[in-house]
Amino acid sequence: MATDIKQLVKEVLNRGYLMSLATSDNGGVWVCDVIYIHDDDLNIYWMSDPDVRHSQAIIANNKVAGTITISGPGESNLGIQFEGTAEKIEGNRYDLALKHYAKRKKSAPKENDDVLGGDSWYILKPKKVELINEKLYGFDKRRIEL
């Protein structure tokens, strides 16, 4: 069953566009939306300015949580909730840029383009994921631990 749930989680990641990312710092909790991409291990990547609050919070406290919701009004609820750790990734990461540009329906950058423009890449490594798929399971969440 865990394999099936992991595949359903991947489907949500494939269909989604924005992730709501929750962080915490000395000022309290904070949430922001970021455009994300993912890999086959369910790791989630995004670009952000390293000086914004959520990026600074990750440096101070790498424990994060998030949600990705696919459904809209009148549709069955579909999405994921997760917790894990996040960190900044060094480098231009052209491989990530290609996926990110494709997701945003932009032309592929050239390998030597400055795709970050002052931003940095970040990775979220989920530890627990809860799937909400009302069509298949009602409101009985399915969970996987990674």
Language model features with spans:
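Short beta-strand segments
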Residues: 16-50, 58, 64-69, 78-81
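Short, solvent-exposed aromatic-acidic interface loops
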Residues: 49-53, 102
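Short, surface-exposed beta-strand-loop junctions and turns on beta-sheet-rich folds
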Residues: 52-54, 73, 137-139
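Charged, gly/pro-rich active-site loop segments
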Residues: 78-146
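Extreme N-terminal tail/first-helix region
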Residues: 1-18
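A short, aromatic/hydrophobic, helix- or strand-capping loop or linear motif
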Residues: 23-25, 69-71, 108-116
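Alpha-helix boundary recognition
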Residues: 13-14, 59, 102
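Short solvent-exposed loop/turn micro-motifs enriched in small/polar/acidic residues
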Residues: 14, 28-29, 114-117
